[in-house]
Every structure is written in C-alpha cells, then in structure tokens.
C-alpha cells in the first residue's frame, strides 16, 4: 500500500495556497497566476495527470475524468474551486497568502474554501492510482 508522505502533502497544499488566485466580483484577476495553476498541479501530482483525462474549460477551469471499470454506471462528481477573494481591508491574524503553520493549523486564504478539498482529493487520487486502484465508475472532478 502506498504511503502518503504527510510532510510533502502539507508542502503541496501550502504551494497551492500561496498562489494568489484572487478574483473579484467584477471579474478581475491576474491571468498569469491562474495560467500557472494547472502546470503546478501537474508537476505536484504527476501520477494523477498520467492517468486521468484533463480538460480546460473557459481557459482556467479544470475538469478531470478518472475512468472507472464500468462507464455505464452513473458517475461520481466532485467539485471545488481554486479562486479566492482578496485580503484587502481585512485583519488577518497571519498573512493571508503565506500559508504559515501556527499551532498545527495552516493559515491562508482558500485553506477551507476550497483549496483544501482540491488538495485532499488530489492526494487521495495520487495514492490510489499509485496502488493500482481503478474506481468502479467514472469520477469527474
């Protein structure tokens, strides 16, 4: 059984959080930062991206399809997002984009909503694929 390297998982999560993927209500965002996100994920989770199909949607949206044993079964759909709101005018106890660890807690914008879910899902997929697991049905993420 493949082991999850917790230290490496935390480092990858911190890297995700340190990317300032800020979008505002007016649709303003830094295109370079968003364009760098998928290549970063591919580098951090090479096993996932060797096995799953990935598709860009509207330039920065990412859809992954992990083909299961029986595609006639209804698929599972998991969702998250990696854009965050900015930290301007907010009083953060720790810098919002440094992903610092204090008392066992990672402090960063997006750590709960929802880069944490993105990281957890990719870590699980990386481990399961390394073990040779194929899901019983297709999984979209």
Residue ranges and their predicted role:
Residues 1-118, 128-137:
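Acidic/His- and Gly-rich active-site-bordering loop/insert found
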